[in-house]
């Protein structure tokens, strides 16, 4: 696998000033039940890296001492870490808002079928990846059957109140392009998602986030191998808008990897 980091270090980026810390993002490990082309940490079923119990205890201590308002859990599939549920319970007991960056298909894996009930019990905010509303596009990016599985799980979540008006159970979806291109305008694409998913599957959700693929790790390596890295970086730089810097996550977020 080719490393894009040396090329990224050469690129200019406008200086940023941090704000007060509000969110702690924690990567609980690189294990995932699927392996996606765009994944920026090379997650997959064969990865073994995961956060230990000792490091999770440090996370909880940090939450308490720094009075962080939001815990943002990611992976891999964060739910595959054996300490996921205990971390969530303890964080929620502190009054911390917890977000789970969810690959919906994990719910259909053996041993994870009760996750929707756990999500409701702890009132987690779910950020579920669904990179398109068309089956062929999703399965081409993530593997055969991923779209159908994702839809079934999202329907389960809707049945438990997620995404429903006035339930307080937040279900947001995430779109990302299949390749080295920019996502469509978010407002228009969200309307398309609502129409297609609602008409075909009866699905509802709170909000759609559109993300550009990060040119690092697996996706960055593919770009380098295909000779598309420079063109993609030019595309990203051409789309830069200074006003978007107000919303950059790293200004009030600290991201912690599985090693702590």
Label the model's feature ranges.
Residues 1-75, 79-96:
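Conserved alpha-helical substructure of the radical SAM core
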Residues 81-85, 112-113, 183-187:
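Conserved strand-to-helix beginnings and helix N-cap segments that scaffold or border functional pockets
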């Amino acid at each position: 696998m080719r490393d894009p980091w040396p090329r990224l270090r050469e690129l200019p980026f406008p200086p940023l000033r941090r704000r007060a810390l509000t969110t702690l993002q924690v990567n609980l490990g690189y294990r995932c039940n699927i392996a996606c082309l765009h994944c920026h940490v090379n997650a997959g079923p064969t990865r073994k890296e995961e956060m230990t119990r000792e490091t999770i205890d440090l996370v909880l201590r940090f939450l308490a001492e720094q009075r962080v308002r939001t815990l943002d859990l990611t992976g891999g599939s964060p739910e595959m870490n054996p300490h996921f549920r205990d971390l969530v319970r303890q964080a929620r007991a502190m009054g911390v808002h917890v977000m789970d960056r969810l690959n919906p298909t994990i719910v259909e894996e053996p041993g994870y079928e009760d996750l929707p009930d756990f999500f409701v019990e702890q009132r987690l905010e779910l950020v579920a990846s669904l990179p398109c509303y068309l089956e062929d596009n999703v399965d081409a990016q993530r593997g055969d059957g991923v779209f159908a599985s994702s839809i079934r799980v999202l329907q389960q979540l809707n049945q438990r109140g997620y995404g429903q008006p006035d339930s307080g159970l937040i279900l947001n979806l995430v779109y990302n392009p299949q390749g080295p291109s920019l996502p469509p305008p978010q407002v228009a694409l969200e309307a398309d998602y609502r129409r297609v998913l609602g008409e075909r599957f009866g699905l509802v959700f709170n909000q759609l986030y559109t993300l550009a693929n990060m040119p690092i790790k697996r996706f960055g390596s593919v770009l380098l191998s295909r000779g598309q890295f420079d063109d993609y970086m030019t595309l990203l730089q051409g789309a830069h808008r200074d006003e978007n810097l107000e919303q950059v996550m790293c200004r009030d977020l600290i991201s912690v990897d599985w090693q702590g």
